[in-house]
C-alpha cells in the first residue's frame, strides 16, 4: 500500500497544487499519468476539459480503492451481510431516475446539478474519513482535496449554478460530531459505507459525464 502512495496515487501536494493553479479560464494542470513535457509540447494533442475531468475522476477512484483495501484488511466490514449494511442510517448521495443522469431520460443540465450537489454533500463524509486511516492518511487527504478540485471543474461547466444546493455548515458540523461519537464498530461500518457509496457515485458520474 505504501508503494501505491508514492506512485499510482500522489501525495496531498498534487491536490493542493491543483487548487492553487485553477484559474478562471479552465487551466491545464498536469493530472496523474500525464507527462508535463507532453502537456507543454507544441505538437501534442491537448486533452479537452471533458477528458481532463474524466481522468481526474478516475484518479480519485484509484485513491478510493487504496482506502477500501486498508479498510478491508483491518476489519471484516467488506464481508458484512446486507442486513448489517441496511442497519446503517447514513443518507449518502446516490443517483435516481429523476436526476436525469441515466441514459433513459438523460438531461445534461439537471444531471450536472445533481452531480455537483452530490459531491458537495459528500464533503462532510470525506472530512469524517480524515484520521480514519493509518498507513493511508495522505491518500484520504488527497481524495478529499481532489474532490474539491473536481467540484470547481464541474461548476465551470454548469449553466444553472443557482439550482445547486449547498449543505448548511451547521448541519454538516452536527452530522460530523454525531458520526465521530459512534462506537468503533459503527465507525468502521460508516467508513466502509462512505467509500463504497462514493465509489458508486463517481462511477455514475463518469458514465453521465461521458454523454455530455
From Swiss-Prot:
GO molecular function annotations of the record: cytokine activity; growth factor activity; interleukin-6 receptor binding
InterPro entries linked to this entry: 4_helix_cytokine-like_core, IL-6-like, IL-6/GCSF/MGF, IL6/GCSF/MGF_CS
Primary location group: secreted
Gene Ontology cellular-component annotations: extracellular space; interleukin-6 receptor complex
Signal peptide (UniProt feature, chain positions): 1-27
SUPFAM superfamilies the record matches: 4-helical cytokines (SSF47266)
Intrachain S-S bonds: 72-78, 101-111
Family: Belongs to the IL-6 superfamily.
Function: Cytokine with a wide variety of biological functions in immunity, tissue regeneration, and metabolism. Binds to IL6R, then the complex associates to the signaling subunit IL6ST/gp130 to trigger the intracellular IL6-signaling pathway. The interaction with the membrane-bound IL6R and IL6ST stimulates 'classic signaling', whereas the binding of IL6 and soluble IL6R to IL6ST stimulates 'trans-signaling'. Alternatively, 'cluster signaling' occurs when membrane-bound IL6:IL6R complexes on transmitter cells activate IL6ST receptors on neighboring receiver cells.
Protein name from the UniProt record: Interleukin-6
Organism of derivation: Macaca mulatta (Rhesus macaque)
Gene expressing this chain: IL6
Amino acid at each position: 500500500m505504501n508503494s501505491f502512495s508514492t506512485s499510482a496515487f500522489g501525495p496531498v501536494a498534487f491536490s493542493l497544487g491543483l487548487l492553487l493553479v485553477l484559474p478562471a479560464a479552465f487551466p491545464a494542470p498536469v493530472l496523474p499519468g500525464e507527462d508535463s513535457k507532453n502537456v507543454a509540447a507544441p505538437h501534442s494533442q491537448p486533452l479537452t476539459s471533458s477528458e481532463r475531468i474524466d481522468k481526474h475522476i478516475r484518479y480519485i477512484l484509484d485513491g478510493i480503492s487504496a482506502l477500501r483495501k486498508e479498510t478491508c484488511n483491518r476489519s471484516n466490514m467488506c464481508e458484512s451481510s446486507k442486513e448489517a449494511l441496511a442497519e446503517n442510517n447514513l443518507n449518502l448521495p446516490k443517483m435516481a431516475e429523476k436526476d436525469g443522469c441515466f441514459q433513459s431520460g438523460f438531461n445534461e443540465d439537471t444531471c450536472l446539478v445533481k452531480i455537483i450537489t452530490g459531491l458537495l454533500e459528500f464533503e462532510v463524509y470525506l472530512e469524517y474519513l480524515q484520521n480514519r486511516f493509518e498507513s493511508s492518511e495522505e491518500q484520504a487527504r488527497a481524495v478529499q482535496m481532489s474532490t474539491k478540485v473536481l467540484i470547481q471543474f464541474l461548476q465551470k461547466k454548469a449553466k444553472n449554478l443557482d439550482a445547486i444546493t449547498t449543505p448548511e455548515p451547521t448541519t454538516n458540523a452536527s452530522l460530523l460530531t454525531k458520526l465521530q461519537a459512534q462506537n468503533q464498530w459503527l465507525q468502521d461500518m460508516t467508513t466502509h459505507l462512505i467509500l463504497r457509496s462514493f465509489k458508486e457515485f463517481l462511477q455514475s458520474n463518469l458514465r453521465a459525464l461521458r454523454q455530455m
